[in-house]
Amino acid sequence: INPGWLENPNPMAEELNKLAKKWDISRPTTGASNQEDPLNGIPDLIAFNRYFGWYGDDCKEMGEWIDKEHRAYPQRCMGISEYGAGADVFQQADSLIHPEPWGQWHPENWQTYYHIENWKQLASRPFLWCKFVWCMFDFSAAGRKEGTTFGRNDKGLVTYDRRIKKDAFY
Protein backbone atom coordinates (compact mmCIF):
# COMPACT_ATOMS: atom_id res chain seq x y z
CA ILE A 1 0.00 0.00 0.00
CA ASN A 2 1.12 3.57 -0.58
CA PRO A 3 3.49 4.86 2.12
CA GLY A 4 1.93 7.54 4.28
CA TRP A 5 -1.69 6.67 3.45
CA LEU A 6 -2.63 6.34 7.10
CA GLU A 7 -1.58 9.93 7.81
CA ASN A 8 -3.39 11.21 4.71
CA PRO A 9 -5.66 8.71 2.94
CA ASN A 10 -7.08 11.32 0.53
CA PRO A 11 -4.60 10.81 -2.34
CA MET A 12 -5.24 7.06 -2.26
CA ALA A 13 -9.01 7.62 -2.08
CA GLU A 14 -8.82 9.94 -5.10
CA GLU A 15 -6.76 7.35 -6.98
CA LEU A 16 -9.24 4.57 -6.16
CA ASN A 17 -12.20 6.78 -7.11
CA LYS A 18 -10.62 7.50 -10.51
CA LEU A 19 -9.90 3.80 -11.01
CA ALA A 20 -13.50 2.87 -10.19
CA LYS A 21 -14.77 5.46 -12.70
CA LYS A 22 -12.35 4.15 -15.32
CA TRP A 23 -13.70 0.63 -14.89
CA ASP A 24 -17.39 1.58 -14.78
CA ILE A 25 -18.54 5.19 -15.04
CA SER A 26 -22.18 4.16 -14.37
CA ARG A 27 -21.57 2.96 -10.81
CA PRO A 28 -21.45 5.53 -8.04
CA THR A 29 -18.55 5.39 -5.60
CA THR A 30 -19.38 5.47 -1.91
CA GLY A 31 -17.56 6.40 1.28
CA ALA A 32 -18.26 6.43 5.00
CA SER A 33 -16.97 9.00 7.47
CA ASN A 34 -17.41 10.15 11.04
CA GLN A 35 -15.78 13.57 10.76
CA GLU A 36 -15.31 16.69 8.68
CA ASP A 37 -12.61 15.91 6.12
CA PRO A 38 -11.83 16.66 2.46
CA LEU A 39 -12.18 12.89 1.95
CA ASN A 40 -15.97 13.36 2.22
CA GLY A 41 -16.03 15.13 -1.14
CA ILE A 42 -14.16 12.45 -3.10
CA PRO A 43 -16.78 9.71 -3.64
CA ASP A 44 -20.08 10.30 -5.42
CA LEU A 45 -21.98 9.37 -2.26
CA ILE A 46 -20.89 9.90 1.33
CA ALA A 47 -22.55 8.55 4.47
CA PHE A 48 -21.77 9.48 8.05
CA ASN A 49 -21.56 7.43 11.24
CA ARG A 50 -23.27 9.69 13.79
CA TYR A 51 -24.51 8.84 17.27
CA PHE A 52 -26.28 11.98 18.51
CA GLY A 53 -28.09 11.06 21.70
CA TRP A 54 -25.81 8.18 22.60
CA TYR A 55 -22.27 9.50 22.97
CA GLY A 56 -23.04 12.61 24.99
CA ASP A 57 -25.20 14.64 22.63
CA ASP A 58 -28.96 15.11 22.38
CA CYS A 59 -30.97 13.16 19.78
CA LYS A 60 -32.32 16.40 18.33
CA GLU A 61 -28.79 17.42 17.34
CA MET A 62 -28.88 14.87 14.51
CA GLY A 63 -31.21 17.05 12.45
CA GLU A 64 -29.29 20.23 13.26
CA TRP A 65 -26.02 18.62 12.17
CA ILE A 66 -27.54 17.23 8.95
CA ASP A 67 -28.98 20.64 8.03
CA LYS A 68 -25.65 22.35 8.71
CA GLU A 69 -23.80 19.84 6.49
CA HIS A 70 -26.42 20.14 3.76
CA ARG A 71 -26.17 23.95 3.77
CA ALA A 72 -22.37 23.80 3.63
CA TYR A 73 -22.30 21.17 0.86
CA PRO A 74 -25.64 21.30 -1.01
CA GLN A 75 -24.23 19.41 -4.01
CA ARG A 76 -23.04 16.50 -1.84
CA CYS A 77 -25.11 13.31 -1.85
CA MET A 78 -25.07 12.49 1.84
CA GLY A 79 -26.62 9.88 4.06
CA ILE A 80 -26.36 8.34 7.51
CA SER A 81 -24.51 5.02 7.51
CA GLU A 82 -24.63 4.38 11.27
CA TYR A 83 -26.79 5.55 14.14
CA GLY A 84 -27.68 3.55 17.23
CA ALA A 85 -27.69 3.15 21.00
CA GLY A 86 -26.97 0.20 23.26
CA ALA A 87 -29.62 -1.78 25.11
CA ASP A 88 -29.98 -4.83 27.31
CA VAL A 89 -33.42 -6.50 27.31
CA PHE A 90 -32.90 -7.41 30.98
CA GLN A 91 -32.44 -3.76 31.97
CA GLN A 92 -35.66 -1.76 32.22
CA ALA A 93 -36.29 1.69 33.68
CA ASP A 94 -39.44 3.55 34.69
CA SER A 95 -37.95 6.91 33.74
CA LEU A 96 -36.00 8.10 30.73
CA ILE A 97 -32.43 8.79 31.80
CA HIS A 98 -29.55 9.04 29.33
CA PRO A 99 -27.22 6.13 30.20
CA GLU A 100 -23.44 6.33 30.21
CA PRO A 101 -22.42 4.67 26.90
CA TRP A 102 -19.26 3.19 28.44
CA GLY A 103 -21.11 2.03 31.56
CA GLN A 104 -22.93 -1.22 32.27
CA TRP A 105 -26.47 0.22 32.55
CA HIS A 106 -28.05 0.28 29.07
CA PRO A 107 -31.82 0.24 29.67
CA GLU A 108 -33.94 -0.86 26.75
CA ASN A 109 -36.28 2.13 26.94
CA TRP A 110 -33.44 4.56 26.13
CA GLN A 111 -32.62 2.67 22.93
CA THR A 112 -36.28 2.83 21.89
CA TYR A 113 -36.48 6.56 22.64
CA TYR A 114 -33.19 7.11 20.80
CA HIS A 115 -34.42 5.41 17.62
CA ILE A 116 -37.80 7.15 17.67
CA GLU A 117 -36.22 10.59 18.10
CA ASN A 118 -33.45 10.03 15.55
CA TRP A 119 -35.88 8.59 13.01
CA LYS A 120 -38.01 11.75 13.26
CA GLN A 121 -34.91 13.75 12.31
CA LEU A 122 -33.90 11.40 9.48
CA ALA A 123 -37.34 10.80 7.97
CA SER A 124 -38.01 14.53 7.66
CA ARG A 125 -34.97 14.97 5.40
CA PRO A 126 -35.72 13.30 2.05
CA PHE A 127 -32.43 14.50 0.53
CA LEU A 128 -30.55 11.84 2.55
CA TRP A 129 -29.76 8.95 0.21
CA CYS A 130 -29.52 6.41 3.07
CA LYS A 131 -30.51 6.04 6.71
CA PHE A 132 -28.96 2.87 8.16
CA VAL A 133 -29.48 1.64 11.72
CA TRP A 134 -26.40 0.35 13.52
CA CYS A 135 -27.16 -2.54 13.76
CA MET A 136 -29.58 -5.46 13.42
CA PHE A 137 -27.93 -7.81 15.96
CA ASP A 138 -25.72 -7.44 19.02
CA PHE A 139 -22.25 -8.70 18.04
CA SER A 140 -18.84 -9.57 19.44
CA ALA A 141 -16.40 -6.68 19.70
CA ALA A 142 -13.03 -7.54 21.25
CA GLY A 143 -11.88 -5.16 23.93
CA ARG A 144 -15.25 -3.46 24.36
CA LYS A 145 -16.09 -2.88 28.04
CA GLU A 146 -19.64 -1.60 28.18
CA GLY A 147 -23.08 -3.00 28.81
CA THR A 148 -23.54 -6.20 30.76
CA THR A 149 -21.36 -8.40 28.54
CA PHE A 150 -17.80 -7.24 27.97
CA GLY A 151 -16.57 -7.93 24.46
CA ARG A 152 -19.98 -7.26 22.95
CA ASN A 153 -21.57 -4.34 21.14
CA ASP A 154 -25.19 -4.16 22.37
CA LYS A 155 -26.49 -1.65 19.81
CA GLY A 156 -28.37 -4.37 17.93
CA LEU A 157 -32.14 -4.32 17.53
CA VAL A 158 -32.05 -8.07 18.26
CA THR A 159 -30.07 -9.89 20.95
CA TYR A 160 -26.75 -11.61 20.25
CA ASP A 161 -28.38 -15.08 20.18
CA ARG A 162 -31.03 -13.81 17.68
CA ARG A 163 -33.85 -14.86 20.03
CA ILE A 164 -35.27 -11.60 21.38
CA LYS A 165 -36.27 -8.57 19.34
CA LYS A 166 -35.67 -5.47 21.43
CA ASP A 167 -38.43 -2.85 21.70
CA ALA A 168 -36.63 -0.57 19.22
CA PHE A 169 -36.93 -3.31 16.58
CA TYR A 170 -40.64 -2.58 16.33
Give the location of each predicted region:
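Substrate-binding clefts and catalytic carboxylate motifs of secreted carbohydrate-active enzymes
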Residues: 9-30, 38-45, 50-170
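Extracellular polysaccharide-recognition and catalytic grooves
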Residues: 34
